[in-house]
Every structure is written in structure tokens, then in C-alpha cells.
Amino acid sequence: MDARLWHQQATAPPRPMPTPIPVETFDTMSDVAQDVYWDDLTTAMTGLVLPSVLAQRASHHLTRLVERNRLRPPGAKAIGSVSASFAVGKSTFVKDWAQAAYRDLLGPACADPRPTWNPEPGVTADWIPHVYITLRAASKIRDVLAALLLTMGYPSEGLVRVTTTRVIHAFRQHGVRLLLIDDSHFLDVSNKDSRDM
């Protein structure tokens, strides 16, 4: 997912739920009307995160972790991880949490279709405070670096040492504060470079 798509998803208004109707009323509707109602309901529920005590705790923990990292000096930071059984909504939860944090961070800039900032005097750059990537099976470090660069609109070709430097520069240039890696278990850790990452 590139930075513009992330921004669009994070700032799009939630889909409205259709007006609830009694089962008796639904049963009297035509097949076409029932299909339309189900389509509206399914569309509105896609990506819906149901509140739970576990989700609230995880949200609080992740928010606190990001805030502590923000206060730390440059260098290594603490890493958060969400782990649970297959298909319980980990990715949906993390995206929901991160997009809420993104909206809070941007504030009035959410209305801008392409937020910008000034990393240094006289320089204007796209403001991309959150970068979200999804790893593919057996991803190597070059694949991760390529995904990060493509997300921010940079060319992804080159030697690992070159693309690593390019990623660091791009993160600094675009004000990246949060890196989200979905399906990190797909990272191929059979070589030292990937394990070091």
C-alpha cells in the first residue's frame, strides 16, 4: 500500500450502516431488495473493528510504546508486535489503531489530499508519518527495502547497502514516525542480513 492510499483510507469517512429492519420486513422484501440490503450491510461491516477489552489494552500498549519511542533519543527503539490466532483480525486491528493515530497526528492536515511538511528550512516534502507494508512469503531484506521505497514513491532497485541508505534518507525526509509491517513472520530469516533487520 503506498502512502497516498494509506492517507485516503485513514481519512475516508466510515461507511454508513444501513438502517436496521425487522426480520419480518426483510422476509417480505423482493430478492433484489434483499441483495441490495445485504450488499450495503456487508460493505459497511468490512474492516469494522469490534470493541473488546483485549483490543483496548493492545491499543493502549501500542500508543504508549510509540509515545515512549518518540521521547527517546535517536537510535534503537522498542518494537511492538501483535500476535494472535489465524484470522482473528490482527491486521484489521492494527490498521484501525494506526489510522486513528495517523488522524490524531495530522490533525487539520487530514483534509489535505497530499499533506506536506518542511523537514528543513526551504525544503517541502510529502509528509508520510506512517509507512505500512505487507510482507510476501520468504521476503528477504532487499524485498523489505524495496517495499518501503515503493510505498514512499522512490525507485526500489539497487544494492542492499544503497537501498538501505535510501530508506533512511526517505524516512528522515518524509517524517516517518511509525513503521507497520504486516505478516512479519514471512521474513526469510535463513540469512544473517534478514535476522539482523
Task: Name these PLM-found stretches.
Residues 61, 93-97, 143-151:
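Alpha-helical scaffold elements adjacent to nucleotide-binding pockets in ATP/GTP-utilizing enzyme cores
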Residues 77-81, 130, 178:
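Residue-level preference for the first positions of well-ordered beta-strands
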Residues 100-119, 154-155:
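Post-Walker A helix-loop "phosphate-sensing" segment adjacent to the P-loop in P-loop NTPases
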Residues 133:
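Hydrophobic residues at beta-strand termini and immediately following loops
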